[in-house]
């Protein structure tokens, strides 16, 4: 069963691989080389789909110095059309709606083949950010322009830990047309389980079926990468930080932690009857970290009931 049918039927148990497009300064030839190598790496895994991120500068959200400088990347839709057009499974394209005018979004959505393209809309990173199109308007446009385009939303366990209402945001997004959710990178498994539990019982109380939640896992090859994850707003429990800091091999230790987190979430969702997917994120340009992400995806592929 392909990814679209799994999501529509709310069955879950699928595997995605998430990528950041090359830097904006990358030549067309180099971008094609990157795309070709990516396909070679992922082909043996049999992933059910790809995610392409839409990277935005989030310094307005966090005034602290960014551990790694912000470098603009290619538009994920352009990268897909020009360099990954032969990819064989569905692709989820992120759209940071604040960056695009309503006409931009209309034009893009109207040309999407809904059999092989899906979307996740992400709102502005802070109230101070200039907004070309709000998340709510973008959701409405999708209903008007291309209602068959499967739409996803973001799920943020950390926000649920702080405010306790993320499950209500998920239900509201579901009512606005979202067919699935994708989490931020999960390091705090308890925060993710709390969100899943509250969402599951809220759906039960309202008499609606939960939609798939895709949990994002990522490896971490250095303490500076860990610092960057925190800058992005991801909660990393101190015991995990201690494990990674004192490990003989930080990267290998992070793979073990990510796998354990994924397996715990799989078991929990199956028990609660919440459909789920797994996304392994690879955003590093370091070959060792990319290969570790592929290795993690391979391990998790064997644990899914696909």
Q: What does each of the following model-derived ranges do?
A:
Residues 87, 144-146, 202-209, 272-273, ...:
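Short helix-capping segments at alpha-helix termini
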Residues 169-222:
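Aromatic-anchored, glycine/proline-accented short structural segments
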Residues 1-164, 245-249, 282-304:
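Active-site beta->alpha loop and helix N-cap motifs at the rims of alpha/beta catalytic domains
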Residues 118-127, 175-191, 278-285:
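Glycine-rich phosphate-binding active-site loops on the catalytic face of alpha/beta enzymes
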Residues 162, 184-185, 218, 254, ...:
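Glycine- and other small-residue-rich loops at beta-strand/loop junctions that grip anionic moieties
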Residues 255-306:
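C-terminal extensions of enzymes
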Residues 208-274:
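Catalytic-face loop-and-helix region of soluble metabolic enzyme cores
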Residues 18-19, 50, 112, 173, ...:
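Conserved, mostly hydrophobic/aromatic
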